[in-house]
Amino acid sequence: MRFASFAEKGVNGLAVRTKAGGWSGLLENADGFPGSLETLLSRGNSLNDAAAILARGKPVDLDQVTLLPVLSNPGKIICVGLNYADHSAESGFKQPDYPTLFGRFNSSLIAHGAPIVRPKLSEQLDYEGELVAVIGKGGRNIPKARALDHVVGYSIFNDASIRDYQFKSPQWTMGKNFDDTGAFGPTLVTSDELPPGCFGLKLVTRLNGQVVQSAMIDDMVFDVATQIALVSEAITLSPGDIFVTGTPSGVGLARKPPLWMKHGDICEVEIDQLGILRNPIVDQK
């Protein structure tokens, strides 16, 4: 199944991809609206049941509505840095033996099609194409062998980073949380439609049509199951939490000269079977 969170005339809604290839859905003020993805996941409601209800709704043209982040308010945004060996090397870091974790805040999130904003404070706006794993079943001390059972689906993220602010201190939080820099979308694809852990899928990032990142999901140092198992040793995971699983080599920071995103650019992140996350770049007003 594929779900799209959207808004029309200021009212939020949810749509599902139909068997015919179109989209059908309901606005939250319509009779029978099953709830947002956050609500469905937090309540443990069946996405199959929600999909059946939405499929009986009205046709939705995703090009004519405003897409929202797949989840506008994830419970936790758990990001993994230095998770591709080539990226660690190009960034000047020794490959860590344990996942490098940091967090994002919901206030940084934007949707497919929304502009990534380059702040007035810095020109060092960098792209980072990444796979997102969405938690559908919570837990603590989750065994790696069962970790993927806790993933309801996958999406795409552009972890756009303000590099000079990222490295002002040993903690990366500031440079990873500027407003309107975390693009998340375009849709949620449920796990049953994809290979386990998205192994075998390719990630490609393009800036103005030119490929700047290209890697297989298999190239991760710590795969999705490992990330879930290790993080859940310390933190209870809840439905609606997301893992932003790391970016491959090719980032602008590592290029000579550096390649920063600027006003008027278009950045795309594509992952096989998940679609394309596309965002324009604009300067902060």
Where are these regions (language model features)?
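N-terminal non-catalytic cap/leader segment that marks the start of a structured domain
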Residues: M1-P99, E268
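Catalytic-pocket segment enriched in acidic/His residues
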Residues: E8-G10, H87, F93, R163-K285
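A generic local secondary-structure boundary/capping motif
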Residues: A4, L67-P69, A89-G92, I116-L125, ...
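Non-heme Fe(II) oxygenase catalytic core, chiefly the N-lobe of the double-stranded beta-helix
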Residues: A111-A147, V152, F157-S161
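Short beta-strand-to-turn element immediately C-terminal to the catalytic PLP-Schiff-base lysine
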Residues: F6, V16-T18, E90, H112, ...
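Short catalytic-site patches enriched in acidic/histidine residues
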Residues: G103-P119, G139-R140, D180-V189, P248-G252
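Structural signature of FAD isoalloxazine-binding scaffolds in flavoprotein oxidoreductases
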Residues: Q95-H112, Y127, K262-Q273
